[in-house]
Amino acid sequence: MALALLEDWCRIMSVDEQKSLMVTGIPADFEEAEIQEVLQETLKSLGRYRLLGKIFRKQENANAVLLELLEDTDVSAIPSEVQGKGGVWKVIFKTPNQDTEFLERLNLFLEKEGQTVSGMFRALGQEGVSPATVPCISPELLAHLLGQAMAHAPQPLLPMRYRKLRVFSGSAVPAPEEESFEVWLEQATEIVKEWPVTEAEKKRWLAESLRGPALDLMHIVQADNPSISVEECLEAFKQVFGSLESRRTAQVRYLKTYQEEGEKVSAYVLRLETLLRRAVEKRAIPRRIADQVRLEQVMAGATLNQMLWCRLRELKDQGPPPSFLELMKVIREEEEEEASFENESIEEPEERDGYGRWNHEGDD
């Protein structure tokens, strides 16, 4: 991180990074004269230098300065740290062989992957580096070209997102950090859709959240069918760990659910939605008519005032039934309007009493 900052800073200041130093850990309240006093004493063996700039590093809560060496210096003479006021100041510098070492590791990695440096540049959208020119380019220049290529490489259309799943084991006595199957399944069903990776990688990430019997099941279904999809894996989990409730039971439970005394219509609809989704998952209710079934059940199972009944009846007659959120919006608006009307009704008698007393005093 510090070395990368040194390289970027040198690039901005247009100075040779091989002839520059960065000193970090300088107390933020130090003036330039105080910094110079310490550096002149501790770096005098390096010869003449020039202080090019100072920045504040938030992560260290301290300053850093960039120095340009004005004389040829033996790298071995550069200290890695100096004793400054307020503590030790670190000295960051780039050794001449760091680019070479990096490129050696890069070549070794590419060789293992069956790739070449020129092929890597082509993949980054840089066509100017051919196989014939690579051996003729110095390590320093090649590292510089690679840095430029990486900076200008096209970014992926989708950011790499990896929302980690919670843990599920399927054990009879789950550990405290584990989720119930229903909660885990709901989260897994949503999150796997966001993972912009291959099916194989999705299955690997899915397996990372599993323990015990659940992980055993994952291994079994993959052994039986190596090309099984993530959705099919989740379906297998439903069959093994899901509720044993039948289609008919799920359907009847939904249709026999009514608004309870004192329960708001919006709260009833929210409670009903959980049962509807379960019935749809069991294929007890076709997904394509879920909105219609929801609206009909609310009209049949809830105690509605005349205004809300008329609005829902209008929605049913006019066209496609509303979605869950659209229906909730209509119901919440009506509940707020009804609550506002009730508050006004409570305040009106008090206002009439006040006017009566005022008129009575006026008569006196």
Curated annotation (Swiss-Prot):
Brain-specific. In some cancer patients, specifically expressed by testicular tumor cells. Keywords: Acetylation, Nucleus, Tumor antigen. Its main location: nucleus. It is found in: Nucleus, Nucleolus. GO terms for biological process: positive regulation of apoptotic process. This is Paraneoplastic antigen Ma2. InterPro entries: PNMA, PNMA_C, PNMA_N. Belongs to the PNMA family. Residues 335-364 are annotated as: Disordered. Antibodies against PNMA2 are present in sera from patients suffering of paraneoplastic neurological disorders. The modification N-acetylalanine is found at A2. Residues 335-351 have a biased composition (Acidic residues). Residues 352-364 have a biased composition (Basic and acidic residues). GO terms for cellular component: nucleolus. It holds the Pfam family PNMA. Coiled coil: none annotated.
